[in-house]
């Protein structure tokens, strides 16, 4: 059912978010759909605990592949609503819309390097500060504050680099 949901959201994206001169990068093809599956395959099966965990992984990957390309709030909100509808229809799960935006996966929150669901910003902050301290020992020191948006962007960057 997850593949059917991914195909459904892909269909909605290519039909609703058409390229315009201001949004010429809204050009998608089947390779983008395969990136959703590729992102899901980065997660080790030992880490996937249940159906809800798998759906969160699916949500994260569709958001990274499709939603992160959208440049205005109206388009991002429409994508979130479409995703919510697809999740309800295909995967029989009813979540509140704000819960969708806070799902993030990465490989820097555990010692094994598994791609898995990240904790909250408060959970990640000590780990990120340790990684920053290690970096600062070897390079020119950086002084970073790990607020919520920063952690979300770090997760996105780490995902890109992992691929």
Would you name each region that the model predicts?
Residues 1-162:
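Alpha-helical lid/collar subdomain of P-loop NTPases
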């Amino acid at each position: 059912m997850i593949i059917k949901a991914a195909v459904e959201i892909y269909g909605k994206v290519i039909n609703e978010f058409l390229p315009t001169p201001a949004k010429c990068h809204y050009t998608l093809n089947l390779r983008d759909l395969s990136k959703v599956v590729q992102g899901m395959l980065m997660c080790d099966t030992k880490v996937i605990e249940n159906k809800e965990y798998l759906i969160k992984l699916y949500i994260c990957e569709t958001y990274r592949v499709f939603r992160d390309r959208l440049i205005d709030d109206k388009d991002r909100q429409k994508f979130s609503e479409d995703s919510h509808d697809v999740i309800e229809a295909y995967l029989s799960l009813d979540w509140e819309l704000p819960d969708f935006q806070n799902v993030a996966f990465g490989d820097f929150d555990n010692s094994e390097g598994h791609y898995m669901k990240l904790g909250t910003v408060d959970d990640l902050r000590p780990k990120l500060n340790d990684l920053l301290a290690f970096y600062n020992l070897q390079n020119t020191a950086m002084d970073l504050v790990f607020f919520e948006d920063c952690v979300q962007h770090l997760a996105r960057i780490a995902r890109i680099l992992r691929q």
